[in-house]
Amino acid sequence: MFSNISKKTFFLLPALFLSSYVIGAGAGSLTSAAAEGNWGLSFHEENTPPTANASTDELAQYDAYYMQDTDEKILYLTFDAGYENGNTEKILDVLKKHDVSAAFFVVGTYIESNPELVKRMCKDGHIVGNHTWHHPDMSQMSTLESFQKELTDVEKIYKETTGKDMV
């Protein structure tokens, strides 16, 4: 389904950019003050790429990017699965019925409270992405250790739940 981009690359894009941007922008100040700046996109017109507040050259310094070739029309379905409101199973059923892959970005507590849904996401071939444990504003994290813990705690419970490493 993800013809031009591997699941691993697709998952790593948001995490890689966020990590690169925050660490790169405030690496020297991570232990003394929260990183300054925030990532965002502006959508000015329909059917045009969004405008980012970091240039392609700035992102390239950290081997990060947010957009690829826009000539090929590819749709990526992503779900911010921060909590379960009773719709995830129905969504998974519809995706399976239509043979469509998607990415579900989950927080740690979601995996804790919905292990069977997470196992099904994995079994059905969807990407399960890391959305941190508590969903904090990562640009405001005061230490590198707390920043990393938000990510590694999710990776750990995902592996305990599914038996697989998070891609």
Put a short name on every predicted segment.
Residues 2-29:
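Sec-dependent N-terminal signal peptides of Gram-positive bacterial secreted proteins and lipoproteins
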Residues 10, 45-46:
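Generic N-terminal simple sequence motifs
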Residues 16-22, 34, 45, 96, ...:
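Generic low-complexity, intrinsically disordered sequence content enriched
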Residues 30-42:
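Ser/Thr/Pro/Gly-rich low-complexity linker/stalk segments immediately outside membranes or between
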Residues 47-142, 153-157, 162-163:
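Active-site beta->alpha N-cap acidic-glycine motif
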Residues 144-149:
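Non-membrane alpha-helical structural segments and their capping/turn regions in soluble enzymes
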Residues 166-167:
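Cyclophilin-type peptidyl-prolyl cis-trans isomerase
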